[in-house]
């Protein structure tokens, strides 16, 4: 299978003189078209890993390969074109006076012809349902709308990989759901690979695969159905349990005949509707 991202034995510390490593031998790979989430407690190394992949830190031990090519100081700018990163706070990403200016900014830096930029701006804003807002000032948008524009700015650049670095953590539940729906849609439309750094276990549950980090190391790798199947495993890792897992446990205690495997909220609602219908 085509591995679009390979990470081998990453070791990193923020200060050279420090005895503490933020990452200790992190290794994993992602196949083209996969959605992989990294979860873990604060300080576990999730965001540090994502930023190393995006070439934001120069000095580290180990290997990062993007689409088969090893990341180096010499090729970082070329390889970074294959990656789009959406950060936690959309306000920190805005540079344009209007929504369309902001989406066009990255393309201007890449020297994309004006006619092509105009076409891509409209296509990207349409994909995130923000085309009607293209002449608005970003400051007048809601949090969810701002994050949609940030996503539009990324997909206009035509990356192969999107990295979501806690990109929904500042949104309310409705805004969070809308952004995740939009990203799933554009992933399928543009055949993208997604690496999601998240605290939201319900968000991670929609991934193909989950990596669990603790103290700079990957301590577990599994499909959501396996990882979330037992609440005891999640507690041992030091993480919360998804709402649907807790609800299923309570329902079983009260006599409901439910499968032992993990079900997402939507899957559980569908199952209960069938049983009670």
UniProtKB/Swiss-Prot annotation:
It is found in: Cell membrane. ATP-binding (A) component of a common energy-coupling factor (ECF) ABC-transporter complex. Unlike classic ABC transporters this ECF transporter provides the energy necessary to transport a number of different substrates. In this organism these probably include biotin, thiamine precursor, niacin, pantothenic acid, queuosine precursor, riboflavin and thiamine. Uptake of niacin or riboflavin into proteosomes containing EcfA1A2T and Niax or RibU has been demonstrated. Uptake requires hydrolyzable Mg-ATP and is substrate-specific; NiaX-containing proteosomes did not transport riboflavin. Residues 5-240 form the ABC transporter domain. Disulfide bonds: none annotated. It comes from the Bacteria. It comes from Lactococcus lactis subsp. cremoris (strain MG1363). Keywords: ATP-binding, Cell membrane, Membrane, Nucleotide-binding, Translocase, Transport. GO terms for cellular component: ATP-binding cassette (ABC) transporter complex; plasma membrane. It is an enzyme of class 7 (translocase). The keyword Nucleotide-binding applies. ATP binds at residues 40-47. Forms a stable energy-coupling factor (ECF) transporter complex composed of 2 membrane-embedded substrate-binding proteins (S component), 2 ATP-binding proteins (A component) and 2 transmembrane proteins (T component). In L.lactis forms a stable complex with EcfA' and EcfT and substrate-binding components. In E.coli forms a stable complex with EcfA', EcfT and individually with 3 tested substrate-binding components (BioY, NiaX and ThiT) with a stoichiometry of 1.1:1:1. It is a peripheral membrane protein. GO terms for molecular function: ATP binding; ATP hydrolysis activity; ATPase-coupled transmembrane transporter activity. The active site is at 166 (proton acceptor). CDD domains: ABC_cobalt_CbiO_domain1. The gene is ecfA1. SUPFAM superfamilies: P-loop containing nucleoside triphosphate hydrolases. Its EC number is 7.-.-.-. Its main location: membrane. It holds the Pfam family ABC_tran. This is Energy-coupling factor transporter ATP-binding protein EcfA1. Belongs to the ABC transporter superfamily. Energy-coupling factor EcfA family. NCBIfam families: ECF_ATPase_1, PRK13635.1, PRK13648.1. SMART domains: AAA. The keyword Membrane applies. InterPro entries: AAA+_ATPase, ABC_transporter-like_ATP-bd, ABC_transporter-like_CS, ABC_transpr_CbiO/EcfA_su, ECF_ABC_transporter_ATP-bd, EcfA_1, P-loop_NTPase. Gene3D superfamilies: P-loop containing nucleotide triphosphate hydrolases (3.40.50.300).
């Amino acid at each position: 299978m085509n591995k679009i991202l390979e990470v081998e034995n990453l070791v990193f510390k923020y200060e050279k003189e420090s005895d503490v490593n933020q990452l200790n031998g992190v290794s994993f790979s992602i196949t083209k078209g996969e959605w992989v989430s990294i979860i873990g407690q604060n300080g576990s190394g999730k965001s540090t890993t994502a930023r190393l992949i995006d070439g934001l830190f120069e000095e580290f031990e180990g290997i990062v390969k993007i689409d088969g090519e090893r990341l180096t100081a010499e090729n970082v700018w070329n390889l970074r074109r294959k990656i789009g990163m959406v950060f936690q706070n959309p306000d920190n990403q805005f540079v344009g006076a209007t929504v369309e200016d902001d989406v066009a900014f990255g393309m201007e830096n890449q020297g994309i012809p004006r006619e092509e930029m105009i076409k891509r701006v409209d296509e990207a804003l349409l994909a995130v349902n923000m085309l009607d807002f293209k002449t608005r000032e970003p400051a007048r948008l809601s949090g969810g709308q701002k994050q949609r524009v940030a996503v539009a700015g990324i997909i206009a650049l035509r990356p192969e990989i999107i990295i979501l670095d806690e990109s929904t953590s500042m949104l309310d539940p409705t805004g969070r759901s809308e952004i995740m729906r939009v990203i799933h849609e554009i992933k399928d439309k543009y055949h993208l690979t997604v690496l999601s750094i998240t605290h939201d276990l319900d968000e991670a549950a929609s991934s193909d695969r989950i990596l669990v980090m603790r103290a700079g190391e990957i301590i577990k790798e599994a499909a959501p159905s396996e990882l979330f199947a037992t609440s005891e495993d999640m507690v041992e890792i030091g993480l919360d349990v998804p709402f649907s897992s807790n609800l299923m446990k309570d329902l079983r205690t009260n006599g409901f005949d439910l499968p032992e495997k993990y079900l997402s909220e939507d899957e559980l609602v569908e199952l209960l509707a069938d049983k009670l219908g």
